[in-house]
Swiss-Prot record:
Stated name of the protein: DNA-directed RNA polymerase subunit beta'
Any one cellular-component term (Gene Ontology): DNA-directed RNA polymerase complex
Organismal lineage: Bacteria, Bacillati, Bacillota, Bacilli, Lactobacillales
GO biological process, one term: DNA-templated transcription
SMART domains referenced in this protein's UniProt entry, alphabetically: RPOLA_N
Cofactor descriptive note: Binds 1 Mg(2+) ion per subunit. Binds 2 Zn(2+) ions per subunit.
Amino acid sequence: MVDVNRFKSMQITLASPNKVRSWSYGEVKKPETINYRTLKPEREGLFDEVIFGPTKDWECACGKYKRIRYKGIICDRCGVEVTRAKVRRERMGHIELKAPVSHIWYFKGIPSRMGLTLDMSPRALEEVIYFAAYVVIDPKDTPLEHKSIMTEREYRERLREYGAGSFVAKMGAEAIQDLLKQVDLEAEIAVLKEELKTATGQKRVKAVRRLDVLDAFYKSGNKPEWMVLNILPVIPPDLRPMVQLDGGRFAASDLNDLYRRVINRNNRLARLLELNAPGIIVQNEKRMLQEAVDALIDNGRRGRPITGPGSRPLKSLSHMLKGKQGRFRQNLLGKRVDFSGRSVIAVGPTLKMYQCGVPREMAIELFKPFVMREIVARDIVQNVKAAKRLVERGDERIWDILEEVIKEHPVLLNRAPTLHRLGIQAFEPVLIDGKALRLHPLVCEAYNADFDGDQMAIHVPLSEEAQAEARILMLAAEHILNPKDGKPVVTPSQDMVLGNYYLTMEEAGREGEGMVFKDMDEAVMALRNGYVHLHTRVGITTDSLAKPWTESQKHKILMTTVGKILFNAIMPEELPYLQEPTNANLTEGVPDKYFLESGKDIKEAIQALELNVPFKKKNLGNIIAEIFKRFRTTETSALLDRLKNLGYHHSTLAGLTVGIADIPVVEDKAEIIEESHKRVEQITKQFRRGMITDDERYNAVTAEWRAAREKLEKRLVANQDPKNPIVMMMDSGARGNISNFSQLAGMRGLMAAPNGRIMELPILSNFREGLSVLEMFFSTHGARKGMTDTALKTADSGYLTRRLVDVAQDVIIREDDCGTDRGLLITSITDGKEMIEPLEERLVGRYTKKSIKHPETGEVLVPADVLVTEDMARQVVNAGVTEVTIRSVLTCNTRHGVCRHCYGINLATGDAVEVGEAVGTIAAQSIGEPGTQLTMRTFHTGGVASSSDITQGLPRVQEIFEARNPKGEAVITEVKGEVTAIEEDASTRTKKVFVKGQTGEGEYVVPFTARMKVEVGDQVSRGAALTEGSIQPKHLLAVRDVLSVETYLLAEVQKVYRSQGVEIGDKHIEVMVRQMIRKVRVMDPGDTDLLMGTLMDITDFTDANRDVVISGGVPATARPVLMGITKASLETNSFLSAASFQETTRVLTDAAIRGKKDHLLGLKENVIIGKIIPAGTGMARYRNLEPQAINEVEIIDEVVVTPEDVESTETLVTE
């Protein structure tokens, strides 16, 4: 076998007949499979042991030679080689076809490769191959045209006319093979190149296509006649097995049926040829052989598929590769693994952040080999077999050994669907009773897990390296930040939030208000004995709290609550005391108003202070982010555990419950609804009188009911009691929002009908009063639509992620600095007046290209090529800078990837990115993972305001990434200049916009109803939109440069996500956009050997040009091409990656003709062939590293030993 990690590339070509013979171990002559009595393979059949190898290890067919000592001997009785049975997975056979047969991929694919090579239409080819027409192969002296087609009757007439033997015409694949042999590639290519200089239109397109195929044959050394088969390979029998089922019946792979058909027809044809049967019978048999081979290669590609029992189409070789169940996606990219288990998850509130609970029974099975090794090592039993019995019996002694074996041996937990890298994390196992895995509550958000019956899978990393990587890179305590936006992903939720909210509440006039404590212990004692309440405002001496006080705050009394003293006790000492939930308090310290000189009246001072709001979920998130910024992961994960414990403890003590009495009643609800009914009545009257249109009436009615609901909501908020449990849950961010509250206490409001339109009849009741039957029925529409939308959205979002991963999987950080001289100019992204993404956020974590100077003083705020921190970014924005040039993925010069400086910070760690990080995959996951949160609907703007519906949500993201023509397209100007006039033309219901510039004048026709973005006298630049709507990116690319298209796409994606409240780092979108504009189309080849019209990678294009320019030739010119992600994935340089994505047969057909080489640069292609992936520690620069001595330590000759030393060593030994 080839060593997988040794070879550099993999090539695919057409197989010549000699190549097929060299693979084969013998010819399959009979259609038999196995003997039904002996169940042994038949001689010369499809499972023959002579050809394919023995069915049992080290044993020939007749049983003369058994055992490994006869290895390599060929039995003289039965002719079978004595070897391992697994050779039946790799040895091939062949069938000598009695008539040539065309390969359906090359004749039927689009475009037909055979047709292009011969310059014949696929229709004509089909007629010839399936014996419906003759083709002239050699006209000799007759006036017949070479390659002309004639029917049987015409053929006979021509024979009569010109005499037998005056010309050669044949039918079937044989004729095509003869024609293919006649093709002179060099001459044809020269002719086509000449033709291209003058050709236009359809003729030109066809010439470019033909040239492409012929050039592929010429350069790859494949011969066109190999597209017709004379010899058919037979794949190894263990790849098309026959398995005996219970009850003596057999289940066989469909391929055996298909091969059997081919052999039967081939043998019959041989017999007919021997008998010199009439031509028409032989012809029919040849056609049937052709059809049998077609079905074997790709059943159903032409005509009706061959079916098995129950009219089920048989699975051919092509089907074995295609689709989710095909070889690529089922077996090569996603394998099932050993050392894994799965179980229901339960919550583990007592676990540390890096731990998970594993049931004992599961652990003993997962760690069985480790336990067995340890049993033998301890001499409990003598051999592995006995150890295995011990484990299976459940001997008492194994549990202690198991405890030791799993110590410091991390396991991986995975929850499907794995939408981003946080879907698999490593934990240290803790043995527990029961049968459910225990999961730490804080990692639930990353997994999107809950405990309503979710299941999770567990995997054991085996090798030392795998364990080290799991511990260092994947431990759950390390995953504090979300890779999509760099914000903490492990924020406390639900009970934890509620507990800390309750803990930090303040109440005026509670028992013990104004007491002063000398330290925390005293405060806690007073609390336990009932002198004070958690919410009581008290004083405590600042000297007793180890916090960073300012000079003026030392030796004072701090006015706070008992709860806040407890809350601050779990915080790191270096963090300011948290007295109020503000950023100022968090970053700068406690405001001075909370401090009092000792001896002053504290009660008075406390009553003068306003009550602070408690700490909510958002505030806890800010605290965690700040602590992460200061102390990194270890301290943060410890703090999170303390926050969790505190939260659970106090939410239990608070004992908050929800009852129907907790839902308040709005006194004047009836009046508000009555008013709205009257307004609706008036609106309907106006409509009946014809004063307003139906659309306007509908909009007014729905607006009126919305207003009524909002009025009720406002009343609720105004009258809410801060100690009401529902209000507390809502306000703290633990669960629920104002909309839930107003449906419980106000009114449910308007509902969506099944078609997505809002119904005019609102639901006037709330859940406390209960709904009427009709209202209940209405509300089911909305609920059902919600469920179906979610289901559809999940599938759509998953498919989007898959396409994104595929297009960017080979984007890896390959070097430190690419040395590019280009940068990206960034400003805040806005939409009209609305801020989408501020400059500050876009700047953090990026390297500057040029230094940033203060606009007024000219002082350098940030030098060039420096990683911008949050503080720097804030300083830049505060100085009034509005645009900055940064290093960007879009302008990076690294081949097959990105450099560290152009990428910037790794959002998941908060540090500069490392070489080897698979940033493409991370980008794809970051964009795909929130896909399910985006809406599905295309918004209808109520018929009046706009001319078109603007797509939003998930469909818009797909539209952008697939570079489709958008719905509601904006008209853009191709001229830079001034809008001179906008004229309305009533007859055609259009408007004309005139733009005058220095280079000329542009006239644009826009629909009458379109909303204009410009007015007369406005200055517009090239590519600016004249009307509202989305710009078509391909159109923009034709008018502007590549960078402006990339910037536009980036801004558009951000608009969709930010409008739905999802934050994604720019760099992820940049990675994707860059992959969409990687290709150029050659317009003029110059002196290069490129072909006109070829689509190629921009790096390959610059290479070809560099070589020509060095030798003094004319370089080629090309035009950038914007491709959708699906197209870009299929056009990737790796045929393995493309074939495993979509359109498998087309990709492989094309790659084989070109003799493509896959250099295995991406992740997918390496996974497919089982090579270590070139990312992370799999990169070449990290392999085979040797430890090096940094500095040598000088060795001291004499050692002085003191008695203390001796004693201490002794005590160590005795311990």
